[in-house]
Amino acid sequence: MNKQLSGFIAILFLTACAVQKPEQIISVEDVGRLIKTLSSDEMEGRGTFTPGIDRAAKFIENEFKQIGLKPLNGDNDFRQDFIVKRIKPQTIQATVNGKIIDQQNLLIISDLPSSGFDQSSGNKLILIAAGDQFIQKYREITAMKTPVLVLVDNQHAQMFKRLKDNSSRGRIVEKQNQSAAAMFILGESDAANYKVSFSNMIEELPLFNVAGMLPGRSKAKELVLISAHYDHLGIVKDVDGDAIANGADDDASGTTAVISLAKYYKKLNNNERTLIFVAFTAEEIGGFGARHFSSLLNPDDVVAMFNIEMIGKESKFGENAAFITGYERSDFGEILQKNLAGTDFKFHPDPYPTQNLFYRSDNAILAALGVPAHTISTDQIDTDKFYHTVNDEFETLEVAIIHATIQAIALSARSIVAGTDTPKRIPKLNSRP
């Protein structure tokens, strides 16, 4: 740790003590212990639906128990169980104008166990032409509620193949759409006569968030969320003898922050608002943990969400700095920065607007419901060569950076936790995500 960073930490805690008089309970050693454990090979990359993520969940549960958090209202423990379904195509057949279509040119997107239709069914026929935006069209079509036949120009063959490969591994859904079926056919431009049929294998799979709380004092009904996702990619393609995507920065670093902040606020024991600490599952495959969590509460009760993602390395702005996604969408960042007055640490607006980071983490699920939900990060995402690789390991991180960022979050959140500041709401979407 260099002198400048050490000096910041000293200033940070002197300032904090002057305001809240907390004990210095977030230590570099404990931060290192947490992140090293969560990103160890024993956790096998914390892949969704694997024994590794179960081991990680048990570790987080035990930390919450030792800290003294309480389960969420109505729960008996810290594990928040729910079920999703994985849908894999088993059989798929199509005949167009008397010609049997090759399997590699067929893609079915449907939650139905099996079905079929032909030109007499009165279903829509849609063309995705050479100049069309394929992904935009794909999203619109798969959101439809009725069966549809889609003819795809060969110009989109590469993206078609990618989607077909993804589908063959299985799509994860929360709820089955019992009426829709989109049959995509590559390389055909006319279908005066057609007949298609398919069948899917559908299996139920368990998922689980880990969540605990510190009940508020005078404003217990007002909730502050402190979150990170604890899943990663699991076992991936072998690279030089290593196939474990440990996910040290993504997002064992954020999960470490959640545990550390829980310990910090439990020790202070003066939060006026209720604090909920949650480690989300399945962020990497679609944000299913955050989606389930958001369905269990009234989003209007959530005052703010501190989502913490990848804080393991120096930011683009140098030491003593992090950025906040969606900074301009509320005054959340301004409140945090105000509370850091007198320290060297600064929260900046997201410097990577083209990366759409605001929409790429669990905060987006709550933000869509009107919550001032933002992600705090230090990652230089445009140049991070370890992101989503087997090399995202503990040894690549700077624990002093993580430690300083966690303490900055602890101090900057104080007025929101105390109930004296309330960030402006974010405009809701028309429907729940």
Q: Which residues are covered by each model-predicted region?
A:
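Noncatalytic luminal/extracellular "stalk/propeptide" segments of secretory-pathway proteins
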Residues: 44-140, 146
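N-terminal hydrophobic or amphipathic helices/low-complexity stretches enriched
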Residues: 17-71, 214-216, 221-223
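Bacterial Sec-dependent N-terminal signal peptides
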Residues: 1-26
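Metal-dependent peptidase/peptidase-like ectodomains
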Residues: 270, 280-384, 424
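His/Asp/Glu-rich mid-to-C-terminal helical/loop segments that flank catalytic regions of hydrolases
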Residues: 383-433
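Soluble metallo-hydrolase cores and metallopeptidase-like ectodomains found primarily
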Residues: 165-247, 263, 267-272
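Active-site metal-coordination/substrate-binding segment of hydrolases
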Residues: 103-150, 221, 227-257, 261-266
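Second-shell loop/turn segments in exported
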Residues: 21-25, 41-51, 81, 124-129, ...
